[in-house]
């Protein structure tokens, strides 16, 4: 299996390099090293040898150009374009000599997805301390349904600042401290504490720093809602990405018995600053407190209600599984898995040029 790992890693390098064979430039040196690696990987492995010859810069660009064509309609999950992309990519795998890897002997591993389309409210109001603040959808907040039902509802729920909303026994970290958060809406910092290189991987984002962990963590505490404070440094992208990717249909695996919030959302940093100021707090001070292991949730004395209609639809999609058998019998039961996604956002709201396909 080591040969498989070397082979695929080398292809990744080769696919990113140029096809020109000029001069001793750094790119050329990388390409030459990749060529040597794939040649070694192909010894005694026909599929690897064929792939080493076929996977070139032009080949990879051709695949990307094909599936990003308008004919694939943006490859939305469960769509006609998704099905077309799977069929096309399975054909390319077969051409390269890969073997079908699905349990039924085929290329596809089918699964069900649930499309959740929350009807965004125009505004969201928070009240407390003889004050009221109404947030504007899109500019200040984006919210989605946490449930796979036709309506999501929060009624008179208190807003609580929950730090990073992390429970990590291996790091001796617990942001909740057994505080009862049943029925609350949690205001949560993005990412994880990075002040210690030995804590939460330092600047490396772990599972604890992901938005999906935050929402799941809030649900485990019995919260009815979770709002993440967006900053570009903590997210790694601007609020515009939240605006475009968290509106419209959100695809999820079918819900099981796990706890779920009613609603999950994002607010801008300036909006969060105004919200906590209603309760007499400074956002920077709350952040500083959340950097410590002794942090405890901070009730803000602010309540909110919100109801959204939700459209639910179920679709079928599939994973594509292609296998390159290894040559070492002692490692034949081990598998090195490389993953990527072929689907995308499909067809959405037209842009200024009238184009609605997210290629």
Task: Describe the role of every protein-language-model region.
Residues 22-102, 333:
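N-terminal hydrophobic or amphipathic helices/low-complexity stretches enriched
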Residues 136-255, 260-263, 325, 333, ...:
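Extracellular/luminal Protease-associated
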Residues 17-20:
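Bacterial signal peptide processing site
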Residues 66, 73-198, 298-301, 310-312, ...:
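Noncatalytic luminal/extracellular "stalk/propeptide" segments of secretory-pathway proteins
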Residues 13-15:
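C-terminal motif of bacterial Sec signal peptides marking the signal peptidase cleavage site
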Residues 2-10:
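Sec-dependent signal peptide recognition
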């Amino acid at each position: 299996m080591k040969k498989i790992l070397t082979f695929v890693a080398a292809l990744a390098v080769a696919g990113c390099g140029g096809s020109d064979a000029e001069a001793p430039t750094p790119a050329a040196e990388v390409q030459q090293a990749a060529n040597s690696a794939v040649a070694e990987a192909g010894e005694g492995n026909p599929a690897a040898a064929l792939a080493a010859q076929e996977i070139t810069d032009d080949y990879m660009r051709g695949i990307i150009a094909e599936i990003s064509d308008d004919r694939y309609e943006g490859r939305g999950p469960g769509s006609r374009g998704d099905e077309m992309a799977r069929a096309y990519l399975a054909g390319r795998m077969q051409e390269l000599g890969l073997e079908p890897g699905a349990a039924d002997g085929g290329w596809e591993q089918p699964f069900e997805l649930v499309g959740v389309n929350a009807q965004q409210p125009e505004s969201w109001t928070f009240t407390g301390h003889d004050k009221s603040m109404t947030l504007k959808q899109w500019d200040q907040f984006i919210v989605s349904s946490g449930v796979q039902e036709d309506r999501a509802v929060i009624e008179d729920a208190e807003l609580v600042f929950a730090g990073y909303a992390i429970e990590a026994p291996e790091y001796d970290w617990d942001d909740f401290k057994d505080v009862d958060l049943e029925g609350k809406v949690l205001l949560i910092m993005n990412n994880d504490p990075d002040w210690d290189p030995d804590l939460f991987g330092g600047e490396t984002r772990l599972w604890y720093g992901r938005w999906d962990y935050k929402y799941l963590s809030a649900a485990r505490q019995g919260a009815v809602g979770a709002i993440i404070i967006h900053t570009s440094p903590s997210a790694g992208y601007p609020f515009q990405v939240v605006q475009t990717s968290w509106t419209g249909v959100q695809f999820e695996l079918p819900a099981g018995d796990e706890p779920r919030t009613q609603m999950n959302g994002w607010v801008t940093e300036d909006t969060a600053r105004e919200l906590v100021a209603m309760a007499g707090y400074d956002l920077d001070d709350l952040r500083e407190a959340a950097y410590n292991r002794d942090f405890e949730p901070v009730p803000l004395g602010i309540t909110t209600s919100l109801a959204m209609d939700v459209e639910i639809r179920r679709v079928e999609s599939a994973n594509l599984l292609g296998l390159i058998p290894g040559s070492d019998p002692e490692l034949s039961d081990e598998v090195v898995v490389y993953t990527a996604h072929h689907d995308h956002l499909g067809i959405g709201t037209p842009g200024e040029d009238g184009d609605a396909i997210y290629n």
